[in-house]
Design a protein with these regions (language model features):
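Non-catalytic structural connector segments
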Residues: 11-111, 153, 159-163, 169-191, ...
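Interdomain boundary/hinge elements
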Residues: 136-142, 189-194
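Short cysteine-rich clusters marking metal-coordination/redox-active sites
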Residues: 141-144, 166-169
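Short, well-ordered loop/turn and helix-capping segments at boundaries between secondary-structure elements
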Residues: 12, 28, 32-35, 128-132, ...
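Conserved alpha/beta enzyme-core scaffolds, especially Rossmann-like or related mixed alpha/beta domains
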Residues: 37-47, 148, 186-204, 210-231
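Conserved phosphate/anionic-ligand binding catalytic regions in large, soluble enzymes, centered on
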Residues: 105, 109-131, 213-236
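Short beta-alpha connecting loops at secondary-structure transitions
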Residues: 2-14, 153, 191-198, 222-225
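Residues immediately within or flanking Cys/His clusters that coordinate Zn2+
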Residues: 134, 138-139, 162-164
């Protein structure tokens, strides 16, 4: 209720006493309450996953070499180095926990949809969290791993490019790349906290929750949700 409504409720006490009860006393109580910070500002306290930093780094570079060869194009190397520099040692647990949840779901036959800005992270793609390749539009050969990047702005994403065969081995090229900057995810300088949203199958979701409990422990995992309500005047 508003202050005026509360004053009306206590009007039987008289104007001065009602003001004391509704305004003066609550303000006095509020002044007695000390402001405290439950957690130090600007710090994160992520859970621990053994070898998460080493595992993420290994997964990313193994997948990079699998797709783009033993000597991948420099723009890929530069992009991964920038991303990993912002992630390793700070957010590797976030990535590896998501990777483990996605991998377990896929092993059980259920696809996982990643949504939001995580698609702009090449590390997320190389580690198997998302199917969105954030590199510029390009062709890549699944056989000899030769690649050609289109960086003149003529295409917004690889899916729009014409079909083409690899000039090295004659294999049909894979068209890939959606040209999304990493800053969309972690901001300039990697200052944002990563938020990885994953959509699991309704049939599998409870099992994904149990897997999270297995990773971190019963007392370290909780559900966050939204409760929707309707006012009685709009319900018929």
């Amino acid at each position: 209720k508003t202050t005026d409504e509360m004053l009306e409720e206590f009007s039987y006490l008289g104007e001065d006493k009602a003001y004391e009860v509704v305004v003066t006393n609550p303000r006095h109580i509020a002044d007695l309450v000390e402001e405290i910070e439950l957690l130090p500002p600007g710090q994160l306290f992520p859970p621990r996953l053994e070898n998460s930093e080493e595992d993420l780094n290994r997964l990313v570079w193994d997948k990079c070499h699998e797709l783009y060869g033993d000597q991948p194009p420099q723009l890929i190397v530069d992009r991964l180095n920038v991303e990993l520099g912002s992630i390793l040692g700070k957010y590797d647990v976030v990535y590896m926990s998501a990777q483990k949840l996605v991998q377990r779901s896929l092993e059980n036959g259920y696809l996982v949809g990643s949504r939001g800005s995580v698609g702009s992270s090449l590390v997320a793609y190389m580690s198997g969290i998302t199917e969105v390749n954030s590199l510029p539009p390009h062709y890549r050969c699944p056989k000899c791993r030769h690649s050609e990047f289109i960086t003149d702005g003529s295409f917004g994403c690889g899916a729009d490019m014409s079909d083409k065969v690899c000039p090295v081995c004659g294999e049909q090229y894979v068209k890939d790349g959606f040209d999304i900057p990493f800053e969309t995810f972690l901001g300039y300088g990697g200052g944002k906290v990563p938020d990885i949203d994953l959509n699991f199958s309704g049939e599998y979701q409870a099992r994904a929750h149990r897997h999270a409990v297995e990773m971190f422990g019963e007392t370290q995992v909780f559900r966050a949700g939204t409760i929707g309500t309707l006012k009685d005047k709009t319900v018929y």
